[in-house]
Amino acid sequence: MTNQEISLIFSDIAAMLRVKKDNIFKIRAYEKVARSIAELKEPVEKLVAEGRLKEIPGAGEAIRKKLTELAASGRLAFYEKLKAEFPEKQSSSPVSGAL
């Protein structure tokens, strides 16, 4: 999975949390990490393999766990659960149907 695809997933999560009126700090964390991932020069999967996720700006412990899950399985249970709460058209991610 490319960094761009991962970034879009985290952007989608932020957007869905915003619609749900979730904690604004949580929303901002997902937005920040989405931007950080989009700007990375190295693949997220490489950072996961090398144990270097702390180098991603905005990637706290919960987000690092999600990145590890995504890199390992190509799926993210939290994202899938959120998507189930919204009509398919809410998602802007081109990989949303693939997950």
Predicted regions and their residues:
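Long, highly charged, low-complexity intrinsically disordered interaction regions
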Residues: 1-99
